[in-house]
UniProtKB/Swiss-Prot annotation:
Homopentamer. InterPro entries: Flagellin_hook_IN_motif, FliD, FliD_C, FliD_N. GO terms for cellular component: bacterial-type flagellum filament cap; bacterial-type flagellum hook; extracellular region. The keyword Coiled coil applies. This is Flagellar hook-associated protein 2. GO terms for biological process: bacterial-type flagellum-dependent cell motility; cell adhesion.
Length: 498
């Protein structure tokens, strides 16, 4: 309100009088402003709920519990991990195997035997490279310029598709340490070769780098690459690398068994790993449902309405904080969207799942609802019972959680698909009321109400300005009349004195 200089003749504090008169006039505006604030708080509270729901949605989108293969996860133990370790894919059968390692796979090495120094120049090198275990050669081209030193050449060899790790150092030749260039193949296994594809390349490799080549211009290996030789359950086999897969089990061999004897590996369902994933999901679900139940039961303090600016000025910051905490409480109490969502999620968990001609009930797997009323919908796990089910029937656990498709009948859908759909529909229901950060206010119900109230507030402020101006006009007229009366009285007094 603008301060106006009035009441000079009457001596009255007209600003104060008008201010008090306007307090009554402004009461409806304060009600509208409070209503607007309440709606804004409610909108924000709804959006906080959706943020929590989306946290679970994000978790589920990244979690592998939605995939049937998760429930077929395997764990593999080795009786001697200093010799070999192993992991199992879902295709690995639960079984035990005896493994003997006769030799490890090694990489071929190449050593120059006549390196006397490098002469810089322009060289276009071409090689035919056969990887261990392959029969088809791959062509590799390397361009060397006159600006390249021997270190640059070695760097280019290493970064090319030649498949070697090259270096230059002093190496013992039997009598002394001699500066030498050497290659080590990046791939283990027998049968690989590096061939100079033309005479210029052959001359470079022998003349500049000092390597020996055979009649076919292939580099002569210092040590040939070898295959790993293993025996699994009596079956002898050779492998190109020390990491290989047999019957769904991937072995990583580190040493031979000559000194230690055979190693036993055991493949079994990864009960602990599967259980921990289910428990983590249940914990995340419980966090959400507990939060939603808290909103549904939150106390509503009807005597605590949003504060006006005048009320805030009369209170300390702490008093305002405590007041608004109660004013915001209970804004979503018994909300239909939230209660529908929580009720449906309980139904999703406890309605039996039909799959493979069988029916599956959550309680059969050791997962039940808490008996505490205040924790309605909160899930509890009987660890022993669930682990036993995972061990004896992992496919049944997979069916319970992942059965069906998005187009399946409700009874044929697993729990993860049901919960996914319920979370999605709950978010949409809440967004219809409170929108989201990307939606315009006219796209959701609270936003429409806020727009309407904002229009009412603007109109009412215009009316109040008109009323205030009218009050000032009346008091100004009264003050002018008093001033005239005072002037007339003064004139009469002067006449009487004469």
């Amino acid at each position: 309100m603008v301060t106006r200089i009035t009441g000079l003749a009457s001596g009255m504090d007209i600003d104060d009088i008008v201010s008090k008169l306007m307090q009554t006039e402004r009461a409806p505006l304060d009600k509208l402003t409070q209503k607007k604030q309440t709606l804004e708080w409610q909108r924000d509270s709804y959006r906080e709920v959706n943020s929590k729901i989306k946290e679970l949605q994000d978790y589920m989108s990244k979690n592998t519990l939605t995939y049937p293969s998760t429930y077929q996860s395997k764990t593999v133990t080795s009786s001697n991990e200093s010799v070999l370790t192993a992991t199992g894919s879902v295709s690995a059968p639960n079984s035990s195997s005896t493994v003997e390692v006769a030799s490890l796979a090694t990489a071929a090495t190449y050593k120059a035997n006549n390196y006397t120094g490098y002469t810089q120049g322009d060289y276009n090198l071409a090689f035919n490279v056969v990887a261990p275990g392959e029969t088809t050669a791959k062509t590799v081209n390397i361009s060397v310029t006159s600006a390249d030193t021997i270190d640059n050449v070695i760097s280019k060899l290493n970064s090319s598709d030649l498949g070697v790790s090259a270096f230059k150092d002093k190496i013992w030749n039997g009598t002394e340490y001699v500066e030498t260039i050497a290659f080590s193949s990046k791939a283990t296994g027998a049968g690989g070769s590096i061939q100079a594809a033309d005479s210029a390349t052959a001359d470079f490799m022998s003349g500049q780098l000092g390597f020996s080549l055979d009649a076919d211009n292939k580099l002569t290996a210092y040590k040939e690459g070898t295959n790993a030789k293993v025996t699994i359950n009596g079956f002898e086999m050779e492998k190109l690398t020390n990491n290989f897969t047999v019957n769904g089990v991937t072995y990583s061999i580190k040493n031979t068994t000559a000194a230690t004897g055979p190693v036993t590996t055991s493949v079994s369902t990864d009960v602990d790993g599967i259980y921990n994933q289910i428990k983590e999901f249940v914990d995340k679900y419980n966090e959400l449902v507990d939060s939603l139940n808290e909103k549904l039961k939150e106390e509503k303090y009807r005597d605590y309405t949003p504060l006006t600016s005048e009320q805030k000025e009369a209170m300390s910051d702490k008093e305002v904080e405590l007041w608004e905490e109660k004013a915001k409480s209970g804004l979503l109490r018994n909300d239909s969207s939230i209660s529908t969502g929580t009720n449906q999620m309980r139904t999703d968990f406890y309605t039996q799942v039909n799959a493979d001609g069988k029916t599956y009930q959550l309680t059969e797997f050791g997962i039940t609802t808490s008996s505490a009323y205040q924790l309605r919908g909160h899930l509890e796990i009987n660890e022993e019972k669930l682990k036993a089910k995972i061990a004896e029937d992992p496919q049944g656990v997979a069916n319970l959680f992942t059965s069906g498709t998005n187009d399946s009948n409700y009874s044929d859908k697993g729990i993860m698909k049901r919960i996914t759909n319920t979370l999605r529909s709950t978010v949409k229901s809440i967004e219809a009321k409170a929108g989201n950060s990307t939606m315009g206010a006219s796209s959701y119900s609270i936003g429409k109400n806020l727009n309407s109230i904002s229009t009412e507030i603007t109109d009412m402020q215009d009316r109040l300005n008109t009323i205030e101006n009218r009050y000032y006009s009346k008091f100004s007229a009264m003050d002018s009349a008093i001033q005239k009366m005072n002037e007339q009285a003064s004139y009469l007094s002067q006449l009487l004195v004469q």
